């Protein structure tokens, strides 16, 4: 078993859409970001990559690489999930905390869990998404942006498929 923690933050700016957990959320602003700015997925990717000791999302999808400009973060998550599987792990569970004063997250949490569980190739019961505020304190309290924490538990697959490098060395 391995545990990983991820964190990300993005500032509001420009026009939407505002995407969180793979779900478009009605709001007057979007995020300032190289990709679609989905901070929930970015934190989740970092948590998985951290548990696998594979650095972080910036190393795998640098914002200096034009191919990732405006890319859906769901594509990035699916790639990270393939790395997890290649390394012989599967998701035990994920717990994601969105810190935002606005917009209200409660109406969208189940949709986020559904979307993320699809990309993680797991059940909705293994993915929790919750939201909180900072009681109007700090940058999230001033509605300047959103931050997200994610924690994952990865479980070793009993009989993982061999990695391509291992097959080539046979």
From Swiss-Prot:
UniProt keyword Aminoacyl-tRNA synthetase present: no
Name recorded for this polypeptide: 2-C-methyl-D-erythritol 2,4-cyclodiphosphate synthase
Species this chain originates from: Colwellia psychrerythraea (strain 34H / ATCC BAA-681) (Vibrio psychroerythus)
Gene: ispF
Subunit structure, as described in the record: Homotrimer.
Keyword annotations from UniProtKB, A to Z: Isoprene biosynthesis, Lyase, Metal-binding
Pfam families linked to this entry: YgbB (PF02542)
Binding site for 4-CDP-2-C-methyl-D-erythritol 2-phosphate: 8-10, 34-35, 56-58, 61-65, 100-106, 132-135, 142
GO annotation terms (biological process): isopentenyl diphosphate biosynthetic process, methylerythritol 4-phosphate pathway; terpenoid biosynthetic process
Cofactor or coenzyme needed: a divalent metal cation
Family to which the UniProt record says this protein belongs: Belongs to the IspF family.
Chain's role: Involved in the biosynthesis of isopentenyl diphosphate (IPP) and dimethylallyl diphosphate (DMAPP), two major building blocks of isoprenoid compounds. Catalyzes the conversion of 4-diphosphocytidyl-2-C-methyl-D-erythritol 2-phosphate (CDP-ME2P) to 2-C-methyl-D-erythritol 2,4-cyclodiphosphate (ME-CPP) with a corresponding release of cytidine 5-monophosphate (CMP).
């Amino acid at each position: 078993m391995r545990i990983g923690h991820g964190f990300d933050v993005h500032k509001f700016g420009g026009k939407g859409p505002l995407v969180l957990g793979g779900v478009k959320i009605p709001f007057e602003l979007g995020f300032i970001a190289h990709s679609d700015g989905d901070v929930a997925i970015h934190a989740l990717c970092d948590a998985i990559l951290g548990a696998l000791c594979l650095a972080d999302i910036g190393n795998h999808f640098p914002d200096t690489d034009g191919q990732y400009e405006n890319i859906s973060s769901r594509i990035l998550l699916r790639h990270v999930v393939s790395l997890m599987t290649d390394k012989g792990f599967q998701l035990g569970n994920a717990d994601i905390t969105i810190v935002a004063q606005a917009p209200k997250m409660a109406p969208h949490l189940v949709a986020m869990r559904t979307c993320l569980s699809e990309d993680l190739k797991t059940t909705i019961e293994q993915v929790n998404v919750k939201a909180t505020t900072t009681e109007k304190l700090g940058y999230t309290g001033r509605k300047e942006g959103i931050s997200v924490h994610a924690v994952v538990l990865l479980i070793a697959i009993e009989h993982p498929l061999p990695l391509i490098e291992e097959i080539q060395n046979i």
